[in-house]
Amino acid sequence: MENKFKRTTVTSALPYANGPVHIGHLAGVYVPADIYVRYLRLKKEDVLFIGGSDEHGVPITIRAKKEGITPQDVVDRYHTLIKESFKEFGISFDIYSRTTSKTHHELASEFFKTLYDKGEFIEKTSMQYYDEEAHQFLADRYITGECPHCHAEGAYGDQCEKCGTSLSPTDLINPKSAISGSKPVMRETKHWYLPLDKHEGWLREWILENHKEWRPNVYGQCKSWLDMGLQPRAVSRDLDWGIPVPVEGAEGKVLYVWFDAPIGYISNTKELLPDSWETWWKDPETRLIHFIGKDNIVFHCIVFPAMLKAEGSYILPDNVPSNEFLNLEGDKISTSRNWAVWLHEYLQDFPGKQDVLRYVLTANAPETKDNDFTWKDFQARNNNELVAVYGNFVNRALVLTHKYFDGKVPVCGELTDYDKETLKEFADVKAEVEKLLDVFKFRDAQKEAMNLARIGNKYLADTEPWKLAKTDMDRVATILNIALQLVANLAIAFEPFLPFSSEKLRKMLNMETFEWDQLGRTDLLAEGHQLNKAELLFEKIEDETIQAQVDKLLATKKANEAANYKANPIKPVIAFEEFEKLDIRVGTVLECEVVPKMKKLLKFKIADGLENRTIVSGIAQHYKPEELVGKQVLFIANLAPRQFKNGLVSEGMILSAENFDGTLAVTSLLREVKPGSEVK
């Protein structure tokens, strides 16, 4: 942090209180923000970490209508769940409040009124979709229809979730109201707009000239918006849920959620510090950092700064370290499709393993490009890195100390050249980790911390103190002293990343606290200092545990496919005479068995009313042979025989229907008929 700043205000994007938090939110915003804040606190710097729930906006009203409850019921439920999940996961907010609070309503209204009185808004009349049955204007998300790009049904008025294209309500083909299902009409409505074009000049200089250090994805997106030319943006909308526009003639209108939500950072600070909140938002010696996902870049880098500048008394953000998106098993995370790993469910399924997820999400952090989370990678990083590297080194160092020195830190004797080389390797770790954290490279910083554990593992493997114990206990003492100093350094280096493990390790080391300035020192544990009992820092995660999570996702995928199933188009019309050429008959299955060395095939002996025939069918993955014996099936009797590589000849084709998920269902009859009966 630059010397000109005395304190840092850190904000993290306010999650919508219309559903739980998932790993995409964590990887994109909350884990990196928490790492950074914990790092600053360890350095004894003055920092404030502000969070809260975004409780206004259309997604909340849509869920409320769907569930037949009020929007307040929705936000009360999810605010509590989100807040408790964050707390259990170790996201260390100084305050986690909400935008339905009295403080927020007052401050957001006051903010709008200040800009209104200063003439910072323009009034515009526009045409907007209106639901005549529900008697209300329709927000973007209240309009659905066919996407003009990929032609998927159910695209929203602001975006198609199938192809990801941003849309306007008027882009949709055959639009309909999500409230009544009726076709909406266009009606005139008046709103207030923030003229971003008026702010384009100073925004261009402030971002493109003064903040070239911002991440390329952030800088690039801002440049793209500025190069296209900024347009006025509505700050109000026709809705009955939100903060009422505080001026005359604004009945039935509320503050647009993008205007309302970022003010929540300020109101939450005011709620926490009613007497000193302005120091954290208006003092030029305060540094403001926004942690967000890439879908919020324009709001935090262009729109919110324009709001703050227009108000006139607030500082502007110094950095906006936005991440890209995290995908799940190769597919985009989607709340509506339930394609996510939900934080509250993870905490239930993996009790005491908060740090494993924190570690994996940081190791796979989408800092400059979209990245992917897979359960197999989660397991591998836990077992091969946390357990086999970090945990293994800590355990060996402590267990050997208890075995040979009754758990007391042994005396460090004369150092060998190898000892000195090892100590030199981790002497610079503080500077390396600091350099990376200061520029928000959390993935590389965590990797640097793990390298410290690798150094320790290699040191013990090379020096083999368990072998020297028979001949040279002085040498063993020196080796274990060095190993323990490395362990203590790991407790500090990993504190911002893995706070639960660092706390557990400090207890094992019998140390209440460490400070960041101590990182890299080789005398953190005094000779003779008594250690506590050694415990495993991490546990191996077994295959069946991971398979249970994979199966849960597969079940979700099948449910989504079933819900979105659309039959294939009908094939070209054929003449009746063409159909008559097919001889479709009923046969009774006399025998059925799997074809040896061809596990997908079943061999049937079919009674067709004239003789018995052999038919081979590729349905072995869908039926057990015994399930089909005695059943009647439909088959094409006049299909040319087909010979397989093993010499087997199939004399027909059994008819099956293919379900949406690829499973096959053999066609059958409602009542039994004579074998050989024709299908007409």
From Swiss-Prot:
PROSITE patterns linked to this entry: AA_TRNA_LIGASE_I, TRBD
Top-rank lineage group of the source organism: Bacteria
Compartment(s): Cytoplasm
Motif 'HIGH' region: positions: 15-25
Short motif ('KMSKS' region): ranges: 332-336
Disulfide bridge positions per record: none
Function: Is required not only for elongation of protein synthesis but also for the initiation of all mRNA translation through initiator tRNA(fMet) aminoacylation.
Entry annotated with the keyword Lyase: no
Keyword tRNA-binding: yes
Family: Belongs to the class-I aminoacyl-tRNA synthetase family. MetG type 1 subfamily.
GO cellular component, one term: cytosol
Subunit details: Homodimer.
GO MF annotation: an example: metal ion binding
Binding site for ATP: T335
Keywords for this protein: Aminoacyl-tRNA synthetase, ATP-binding, Cytoplasm, Ligase, Metal-binding, Nucleotide-binding, Protein biosynthesis, RNA-binding, tRNA-binding, Zinc
Cofactor binding annotation: Binds 1 zinc ion per subunit.
Name recorded for this polypeptide: Methionine--tRNA ligase
Domain tRNA-binding: 578-680
InterPro entries per the UniProt record, alphabetical: aa-tRNA-synth_I_CS, Anticodon_Met, Met-tRNA-synth_bsu_C, Met-tRNA_ligase_1, Met-tRNA_synth, Methionyl/Leucyl_tRNA_Synth, MetRS_core, MetRS_Zn
Requisite cofactors: Zn(2+)
EC number: 6.1.1.10
Binding site for Zn(2+): C147, C150, C160, C163
